């Protein structure tokens, strides 16, 4: 079946989104055209502005339309001297939602992966090293993902911190709240056992 070239182009464009295959893209395209053209126009305008105006924070490398993001420019976020290292800007949103962290961040935009040719400079570790040297940082919290690459990246950064006399800590990994032990994989259970703590009364 031959469809409109513009419709085909729209469906192909929608497929750039994660988890969106041909059928999902087709459904989205038809929904926008049939039922929500005003929503489609708002989406197009928001995408155009975001793609052209959003860049990276000069300090932490997260997404922002300013030179320095709101977190990095907030004096209160600098008081405790903590920097939390994450792989993605999305990780910042996840941590901020907990309300348990009041320091600053550094976004790697990935992780070390020698097999893929991704080295320290490719994920901004040269910039992180500059901050370790120039700023009054007391602790680096390593919140990379609990994958082989994430662990390797965390270990590399921990060694970097040691060179500058900065404490490095790793976020805990373990059994999720509400989870059942028989459903937890061996690696997660091993981390849980290794990271156990005393119960005091």
UniProtKB/Swiss-Prot annotation:
GO terms for biological process: DNA recombination; DNA repair. One of its GO terms (molecular function) is DNA binding. CDD domains: TOPRIM_recR. This is Recombination protein RecR. It comes from the Bacteria. Gene3D superfamilies: 3.40.1360.10, 6.10.250.240, RecR Domain 1. Keywords: DNA damage, DNA recombination, DNA repair, Metal-binding, Zinc, Zinc-finger. Signal peptide: none annotated. It comes from Klebsiella pneumoniae subsp. pneumoniae (strain ATCC 700721 / MGH 78578). Residues 81-176 form the Toprim domain. May play a role in DNA repair. It seems to be involved in an RecBC-independent recombinational process of DNA repair. It may act with RecF and RecO. PROSITE patterns: RECR, TOPRIM. NCBIfam families: recR. Pfam families: RecR_C (PF21175), RecR_HhH (PF21176), RecR_ZnF (PF02132), Toprim_4 (PF13662). InterPro entries: DNA_Rcmb_RecR (IPR000093), Rcmb_RecR (IPR023627), Rcmb_RecR_Znf (IPR015967), TOPRIM_dom (IPR006171), TOPRIM_RecR (IPR034137). Belongs to the RecR family. A zinc finger (C4-type) spans 57-72.
């Amino acid at each position: 079946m031959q469809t409109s070239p513009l419709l085909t182009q729209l469906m192909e464009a929608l497929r750039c989104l994660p988890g969106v295959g041909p059928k999902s893209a087709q459904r989205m395209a038809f929904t926008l055209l049939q039922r929500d053209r005003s929503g489609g126009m708002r989406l197009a305008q928001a995408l155009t502005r975001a793609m052209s105006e959003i860049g990276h924070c000069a300090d932490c490398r997260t997404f922002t339309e300013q030179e320095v993001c709101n977190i990095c420019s907030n004096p209160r976020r600098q008081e405790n001297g903590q920097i939390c290292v994450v792989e993605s800007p999305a990780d910042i949103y996840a941590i901020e939602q907990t309300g348990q962290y009041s320091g600053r961040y550094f976004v790697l935009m990935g992780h070390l992966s020698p097999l893929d040719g991704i080295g320290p400079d490719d994920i901004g570790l040269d910039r992180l090293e500059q901050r370790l040297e120039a700023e009054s940082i007391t602790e680096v919290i390593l919140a990379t993902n609990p994958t082989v690459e994430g662990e390797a990246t965390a270990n590399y950064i921990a060694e970097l911190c040691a060179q500058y006399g900065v404490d490095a800590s790793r976020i805990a990994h373990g059994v999720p709240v509400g989870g059942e032990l028989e459903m937890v994989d061996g690696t997660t259970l091993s981390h849980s056992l290794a990271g156990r703590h005393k119960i005091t009364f």
